């Protein structure tokens, strides 16, 4: 948000932050009128009348924000995942549909050129019928990469975040798999949640392996705070070939007995950026189909998968 203000892509009309310290000490303070900061979300909404609200809060508080915004007809985009559990997600979806607001979920990987090129190739039949998807997401750990205390305090809390790595990084694979499997309902979800570093993360898992079974495919989601490096990549196997989504721009494709490396074509606005996408969706310049990575339908399934993994 801070980096985009100077570009004029959007106008911030208010910031609600219930934590007194964070409200007074954040990067937006140097960019915005102090009068735009509020301790109470409802007061901010009633005084500023925003078109949409972007939520950077503990996952547990996503429901609270939707409960405030939906009755006022204000669209919402939350950071991944949609909710801490299925109970919260169902309540949020009910409010959004009843009040006819958009409820979108943002993932970094939604804007990767390679993911969308993979979708296009698969939809064209390039690798045949999908039978296996392996998704790898994570990094060395929140403390290890020096995330701020204001973030790690809730990220490592089983109530506020809903879990550890299983939520933080398992959601990416569930989101992508749901899109690749065209919103098909899984047959089963099996998971192994580990604490490899209990001295650092005593309350939550730091490594999660989730196996999601579909009628014709197996998805293995590996979300971890124990990788030796940061990664967000995916391997998709079909009966005629495979696609390795290596980076946001680079991919390997195996068809007709040969592997080739490609740079995925750039995405066009507004499908290349969360803020452009939100603006276009709110102003009804684009539709958000149920199969979209940001859609409510996709992300309800994501929460169901994560809920099953934790249980």
Sequence positions of predicted segments:
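Rossmann-fold dehydrogenase core element
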Residues: 90-109, 129-133
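Hydrophobic residues in well-ordered beta-strands that form the structural core
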Residues: 78, 103-105, 245
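C-terminal helix-rich "cap/oligomerization" subdomain common to oxidoreductases
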Residues: 9, 52-55, 277-311
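Contiguous beta-strand/loop segments that form the cofactor/metal-binding neighborhood of enzyme cores
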Residues: 173-250, 276-288, 308-309
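Predominantly a Rossmann-like dinucleotide-binding segment in NAD(P)-dependent oxidoreductases
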Residues: 110-200
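N-terminal Rossmann-like dinucleotide-binding module
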Residues: 1-32
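Beta-loop-alpha module in the N-terminal Rossmann-like domain of NAD(P)-dependent dehydrogenases
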Residues: 32-95
